[in-house]
Amino acid sequence: MLFRQVINEDLGCASYLVGDIASGQAAVVDPQWDIAPYLEAARGRGMRITHILETHTHADHVSGRGRLHEATGATMHVSPLADAQFPHEPLDDGAVIDLGTVRLEAMHLPGHRPEHTGLLLIDTSRGAEPWAVLTGDSLFVGDIGRPDLAVDAADGAREQFSSIQRLMELPDWVEVYPGHIGGSLCGSAEISAKTSSTIGYERAHSALTRSDDVRAFTAELISRLAVKPPDLDRVVGMNNGPLVTPGAPAPALDGEEFLRRAQAGGVVIDGRSSAAFAAAHVPGSLSVPSAGSGFATRAALVAGRDDPLLLVGSDEAQARDMGERLAAVGRRDIIGVLAGGFSAYLDEGL
């Protein structure tokens, strides 16, 4: 059996490559914008990605579903409750996808969104019981997924209560693999950076998983809510819509043209360190250091929703990386990167 967890540290997202080595079949669950890790892992094992599954319509990042489908021709699956406007097979509660001896069984877990669906993982060569569950945005390590991104927060929280109760009926040994880790806006400050847990551990060490009072559960979950992901409606629309593929690379601009576009309304995001920015920067630019996690979310929060973006890095490669990370949160309005990086700008004497 092949089981690979793929983490996007910038967004705190987790996705999964699951497959049967003997049959050569594999599935990707919640593919991220960068699909290279799945293709490389499958190729390294001589496997084919035959299925793509979405636990729900994501609101914080753009799915790599379209890119992965284009690269592999894999069948796409999503709940019939999603407003999916692309060819797919319905992922109903109890639906089964067999990949040789590896079985994925859908488990409807509404609350984060009405269509939200977890996946039980079963190794039929060893037994009929699940050894793990991919919980998506229902149960995280140390936290519960937020309920307010698709419906009224109280309504979503009550649905989430029922879904968590259902998950807690699973045996203690079942491993929990969530859709997010610490740093994601789909959880709260309680979400752990740990990448997995078990049903037994979460039951024993989380007040919300033990709660049998829906009103108390709802009040606590709502009290944890933080700022919503930036550009939520646009990202949801992109993920529900036709296949999203990469746009044309942003042009590299010399300093003079870069300044001209900034003066014409472009918002300049400078990804260098705070110290480097303090020493010198393009006039009017915003400092959003790209080192570490959370860059794309922070940059999208400070930039205007409809403002075109211009990117500055220590070198051009850093600016290109910033652009890729911003594309993952739906920003396809990058109109230029500073050619040669900030040192080249200084050399121009502008």
Regions found by a protein language model. Name each.
Residues W33-H77:
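Active-site metal-binding motif and surrounding structural segment of the metallo-beta-lactamase
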Residues R146, G200-A248, G266-V267, S274-L350:
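Rhodanese-like catalytic fold shared by cysteine-dependent sulfurtransferases
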